[in-house]
Amino acid sequence: MFPELNSLLGVTTDTLTLGKFTLLCDSNTDGSFLVHHFLSYYLRAGCRVCFVALVQSFSHYNIVAQKLGVNLSSAKDEGQLVFLEGLKSYTDLLFGDKSEAEETNPLCFLRAGSDLRPLYSFVSAALAPSAGQPWKCPVLILDDLSVLLSLGVTSLQVLDFMHYCRATVCTQYKGNVLCLVHGAEESGDEENELVLRSLSHQSHLILQAEGLSTGFCKDVHGQLKIIRGAVSSGKRGKNQPEIYQYKIQDKHVAFFARGLSAAVL
């Protein structure tokens, strides 16, 4: 995890806020560093995490996590992490036994053209409380919802799925939900824009990574907008975002106020 980001958000691994939905989004840049941060943060905090990875392989996430001081393989073996590797599930769905895939694959809705109930069932079962488990609150992380739209899932199906996930994980299980959605400029379609806008109004916290309007800079890789309390305030349009610029390094992300990078000073 990135300590500077924790400081900006006012959180530690000892103080967890429960029942919250966090929306991660990016525009003209790659916001995946936010996903890696929260994955390592919640594992370090001792939470049980269900990670739905629709973009990269398990080995990719594990390599990045090890740089951040977390071993995903150990977390899986200990039962702390439930990892759905979307790329492998796609392959099994396309080239595996059809009847078996439809029975056990959480992504079988892609072949059947049905709703996302199999994926929801997988998530709810993975995070269901059980007696004697040592983990703290359950956490669902999805990387990323835009992939489902590109595979033919409708915006209504995605929003229904997220509604049930939030109702189950946030309200019933007293846990947290995070998801990444690409900005509308990146995808260029109305379905993605509808999902992004709808989830923005439903979220408790929004982290939006943006590319610089001035173009590439080796010392400043982008800016991060932090919008708090989008749900609880009831005044989503009046919330003033906190804006920081950042530079991504190998094992660290440095944050600073706009115009105050080391290169400028």
UniProtKB/Swiss-Prot annotation:
Origin superkingdom: Eukaryota
Compartments reported by the entry: Cytoplasm; Nucleus
Keywords: Cytoplasm, Nucleus, tRNA processing
GO biological process, alphabetically ordered: positive regulation of cell migration; tRNA wobble uridine modification
Pathway: tRNA modification; 5-methoxycarbonylmethyl-2-thiouridine-tRNA biosynthesis
Main localization (coarse): cytoplasm
Function, as annotated: Component of the elongator complex which is required for multiple tRNA modifications, including mcm5U (5-methoxycarbonylmethyl uridine), mcm5s2U (5-methoxycarbonylmethyl-2-thiouridine), and ncm5U (5-carbamoylmethyl uridine). The elongator complex catalyzes formation of carboxymethyluridine in the wobble base at position 34 in tRNAs.
PANTHER family cross-referenced by the UniProt entry: ELONGATOR COMPLEX PROTEIN 6
Family: Belongs to the ELP6 family.
Protein name: Elongator complex protein 6
